[in-house]
Amino acid sequence: GYFSEVNPVFTSVPEGVKLDFAVTVNPVTTGVSFEGNTVYSSEVLTKFMDIQPGQVLNSVSVGQKVQGINAAYARDGYMLAHVDGIRVDDQGVLHIHIVEGIVEDIIPAGNKKTRNKVITREFVQKKGKPFNKFLVRRSVERVYNLGFFDDVNVRMLPGEQDPNNVIIEIDVLEHKTGTITLGAGYSKSDGLMGIVEFGEDNF
């Protein structure tokens, strides 16, 4: 993992053909820099990489440690987050770019009587923050527990501003939340009276 390029070189000699290899050694690293990370600090991610300044870059080791970063994001629920690019600049600094799968928007669908804000205010997953499956699951439970819906589902759509982002669509199936009260009364002036009251509680 210490070489970026290995090329065979064949040379004719009296005994036949001599085989040599021309190698390009990976650069010596002077540090590591992270871009796009908000969930974990650069200090925490630097500990994941464990790169010592002055060492020749080992691409195999870097690949393994990058997978460790991806696994940490996934373990904590950030299922769309991953290392998106790695490069070494002329000064030997290793730059690691991370995309975290930002939620661009949260859009209710299927609600005809229930106002959008009644649904979205129950979401603990917020717009502008990295998508987290645990927060989305809790949000769906909160929406369902409102008692207005027979079914609540989430669809993930590609982001419009950035394909690495996501738009959350909350698809709900409303049940009848209206209440009807029937009653009857009697007065000397009006005789028998009917009482009908109708109310909606999902506003």
Question: Residue locations for each model-derived region?
Answer:
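Periplasmic polypeptide-binding modules associated with outer-membrane biogenesis and secretion
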Residues: 1-192, 197-200
